[in-house]
């Protein structure tokens, strides 16, 4: 990869991945230090520790909850920006727009879910928190499969297979983790369910980091123009100009 030919926009998915993963691990270590959750490598429950190391429990009490809310809000914003830019990137290249639109809507709903689970802690409002979790995991998984299909179909710069196959593999791993997570939860095997949850989230973040492969080929610009109430068409402008020149003669 030639750094001189890469767009700076390639760093957006990477910043999303690195920032969110680092923030979540900071929340985890704060919660472990305060004895709010068990460590992920713990084999037995310690006295005084209340919960298995689920992410929701880690970010349930201050000060970890403050960091968790901020991380999830920033992650939701960055994911929304990535969703819009990815949609714009693929829009002129897909014949059937519905798959691209579905990818945009799915990631927007997943982003909304991030704000719900980040701002409504589990013990404060369990119902809304669980809705946010379902939106994030459900539509996040759907987004992964849609983007994997679009990657193979559009084949930007003939890199479709190189980027698409790892995304298909990650999508399969994410789907397996989601199913396994709910199975373990239903059987009250909480330590293993928590480990699967952390693995699931890290796979999500790694997946979106791979979007840097296509983003490095594109440059995005925001065009700002002043609104003119009495806007004249090009022909009207020429007509006025010719009349002015006639008057001068």
UniProtKB/Swiss-Prot annotation:
Protein's UniProt keywords contain NAD: no
More details: Tentonin comes from the Greek 'tentono' meaning to stretch.
Alphabetical UniProt keywords: Cell membrane, Lysosome, Membrane, Transmembrane, Transmembrane helix
Subcellular localization, as worded in the UniProt entry: Cell membrane; Lysosome membrane
Side Cytoplasmic, residues: 1-9, 86-97, 152-168, 214-249
Organism listed in the record: Rattus norvegicus (Rat)
Keyword Cell membrane on entry: yes
Name listed for the protein in its UniProt record: Transmembrane protein 150C
Pfam families listed in its UniProt record: Frag1
Family: Belongs to the DRAM/TMEM150 family.
Function: Nonselective cationic channel with high permeability to Ca(2+). Component of a mechanosensitive cation channel. Confers mechanically activated (MA) currents with slow inactivation kinetics. May contribute to proprioception.
Recorded topology in the membrane: Multi-pass membrane protein
Catalytic activity: Ca(2+)(in) = Ca(2+)(out); Na(+)(in) = Na(+)(out); K(+)(in) = K(+)(out); Mg(2+)(in) = Mg(2+)(out)
GO biological process: cellular response to mechanical stimulus; proprioception
Membrane spanning stretches: 10-30, 65-85, 98-118, 131-151, 169-189, 193-213
GO molecular function terms attached to this record: mechanosensitive monoatomic cation channel activity
One Gene Ontology cellular component annotation held by this UniProt entry: plasma membrane
Extracellular face residues: 31-64, 119-130, 190-192
């Amino acid at each position: 990869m030639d750094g001189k030919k890469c767009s700076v926009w390639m760093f957006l998915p990477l910043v999303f991945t690195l920032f969110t993963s680092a923030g979540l691990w900071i929340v985890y270590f704060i919660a472990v230090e305060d004895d709010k959750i068990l460590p992920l490598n713990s084999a037995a429950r310690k006295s005084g520790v209340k919960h298995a190391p689920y992410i929701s429990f880690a970010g349930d009490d201050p000060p970890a909850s403050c960091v968790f809310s901020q991380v999830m809000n920033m992650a939701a914003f960055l994911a929304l920006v990535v969703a819009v830019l990815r949609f714009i990137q693929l829009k002129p290249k897909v014949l059937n727009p519905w798959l691209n639109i579905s990818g945009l809507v799915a990631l927007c709903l997943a982003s909304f879910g991030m704000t719900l689970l980040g701002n409504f802690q589990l013990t404060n409002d369990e119902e809304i928190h669980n809705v946010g979790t379902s939106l994030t995991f459900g539509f996040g998984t759907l987004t992964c499969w849609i983007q994997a299909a679009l990657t193979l179909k559009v084949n930007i710069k003939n890199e479709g297979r190189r980027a698409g196959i790892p995304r298909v593999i990650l999508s399969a791993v994410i789907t397996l983790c989601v199913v396994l997570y709910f199975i373990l939860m239903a059987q009250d095997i909480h330590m293993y369910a928590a480990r699967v949850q952390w693995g699931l989230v890290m796979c999500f973040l790694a997946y979106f980091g791979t979007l840097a492969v296509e983003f490095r080929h594109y440059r995005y610009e925001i065009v700002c123009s002043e609104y003119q109430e009495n806007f004249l068409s090009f022909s009207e402008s020429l007509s006025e100009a010719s009349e002015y020149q006639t008057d001068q003669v």
